[in-house]
Amino acid sequence: MELFFCYNEGRKIRQENKMSEPLFLHSVMQEKIWGGTKLRDEFGYDIPSEKIGEYWAISAHPNGVSKVANGRYEGTDLASLYAEHRELFGNRPEPVFPLLTKILDANDWLSVQVHPDDAYGLEHEGELGKTECWYIIAADEGSEIIYGHNAKSKEELRQQIEDKNWDALLTKVPVKAADFFYVPSGTMHAIGAGILILETQQSSDTTYRVYDFDRKDDNGNLRELHLEKSIDVLNIGEPANSRPVTVKADDLRSTLLVSNDFFAVYKWEITGKVDFEKTADYSLLSVLAGQGKLTVDGKDYPIQKGSHFILPSDVEAWTLEGQGLELIVSHP
């Protein structure tokens, strides 16, 4: 809590308390050809159609900007808040809010795709590239992802794509709930049907499609592919997944899922009351299971499965309390 004083001709005339507070968010649903209803069924979100594929839970990207839902910044969009109150984010140097947290409901296969790195993305698309990672919230039995490819050179890669030799080219991996995958830029990938994922990524919406299963949109048209750009940016060699590291202390089990130049991502499992102190300029938190409360500056905030919030830089300490709470936490 910070104390502020107002003065008039050298006399103190008023005193007020400015309390630190979390930033809860109203966010944007994205309809997708492969989407479904699990965002409603699993999280209770009000979805506008039966084909909602993505919930951009914490986003300042212009294609889906979150708005603050509480406190003195209520109604302010996250992009404006970041631009006008950089002190809330540790006065970090990134010119735009650098991260995006989304939940994806893959009712059908997503396209086989790849994302560029920052240099290629800025040169060709005018925005950042995309390195991302996936935490599998739920997966139907037998669900798979595509994670990498088998080509040994760019020439072989091009030939396999031109020949549409997908079975030989693409690497399929079975998945289950609580699996984690690190997907750096340049990785061939696709999320399979029946999978619910929390994705942490750079704030970018650039995707190059390699293959889309020859399906058509609502107007009967095939979706655009981006073969030349895909071949430009695809890595050769197997992707290297991260090696999560878990530590247990009292009522907290904390797993570092990945740490790189763009973000660090953790899974917190809480079975009681845990006090925290700030170790990052700001943090993004998503509740995937359970319910409980967040306490900041003596004020309690109820949280439950489906809650998403930011702890800005002025929140020096906080408490999380609940049974069976599971959160994904990230910071730049």
Feature locations, PLM:
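Transition-metal
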Residues: 2-152, 214-240, 265, 326
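Ligand-binding loop in jelly-roll beta-barrel domains
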Residues: 96, 104-109, 118, 128-129, ...
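Short, structured beta-strand/loop micro-motifs enriched in basic residues and often containing a Trp
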Residues: 159-167, 291-293
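An exposed, glycine/acidic-rich loop-and-rim segment of catalytic or binding clefts
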Residues: 163-169, 180-182, 188-239
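Short acidic-glycine-tyrosine-enriched beta hairpin
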Residues: 170-182, 297-314
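C-terminal amphipathic alpha-helical segment
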Residues: 208-275, 279
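Short beta-strand segments in beta-sandwich/barrel cores
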Residues: 273-275, 290-295, 308
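Structured binding elements
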Residues: 285
